[in-house]
């Protein structure tokens, strides 16, 4: 971050740090990046720094996080924020917060500190197929809702070359899919696991990581 003046400026002004833990992203010049679970812009900042020509479509349903995201990317015409969650069906749903407002999920925790009504819809309600220009990257980090979010992307998954998704080895929330579930779904959609990144530990053991998937027959 210290070597990138724009990222340092964002940190000093907004206290938002780019997701530098994602070190294994494919070496491609992405034209389109879809950031589902954008929060305050950590991953989108990394993308803007690494792929400055990419158009970023970010999705963040939590109003406080979306407001911060807008201030971080104010004036950037290549970053488009959609204040919504991606889900298989359209409608209003509940975002559960089990602590600080950076930990929201559409899956209910054991005890929710706060419940927020949010808009949810499939990706196709926000983007047309021709808006996803190749090479294209899809990123999902939605606190246990990744499987349902992928179902919400189903009609447009063929437009993506690569997918980055958080994978869990242990269940944090009731009904949360584990790594094997997501790997199987993406395999059925024509993607192969090609890399691991951003490891998280619990009690000294790896509990989660980001899986990097590439299409077996790239769209680019």
Segments predicted by a language model, with ranges:
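Phosphate/nucleotide-binding beta-alpha loop and adjacent structural elements of enzyme active sites
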Residues: 1-220
